[in-house]
């Protein structure tokens, strides 16, 4: 398991995911701040398998130019959890179209 945390660890959900990943012997990558391009780069660089986002992060990822969105290999991703706020249906549908059926709602 390779978990990418784009959210601050003073929130309980990312902190819990980081702790669980470490507990099972996985690798954790923690972003200092969320940057959509850097986020995609890190997924590819570290073959990230698990991540957790908020709907605003989805929106920022979807606003990237197509060339940036398709430049990175995201095939390692197995589970992407979104939480903390309701996700607009259109945003979630666009993310599923892009990443496939790996998006899980935790709200």
Describe each model-derived feature in a short phrase.
Residues 1-2, 10-49, 64:
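Conserved AMP-binding/adenylation subdomain of ANL enzymes
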Residues 5-6, 30, 81-83:
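Thr-Gly-centered strand-to-loop micro-motif
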Residues 7, 13, 55:
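Glycine-rich, N-terminal phosphate-binding loop of Rossmann-like dinucleotide-binding domains
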Residues 23-24, 48-53, 62-107:
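Gly/Ser/Thr-rich phosphate-binding loop
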Residues 1, 7, 78:
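Nucleotide donor/acceptor-binding cores
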Residues 34-35, 56, 86:
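Short beta->alpha linker loops
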Residues 5, 17, 38-39, 57, ...:
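Hydrophobic alpha-helical segments typical of transmembrane helices
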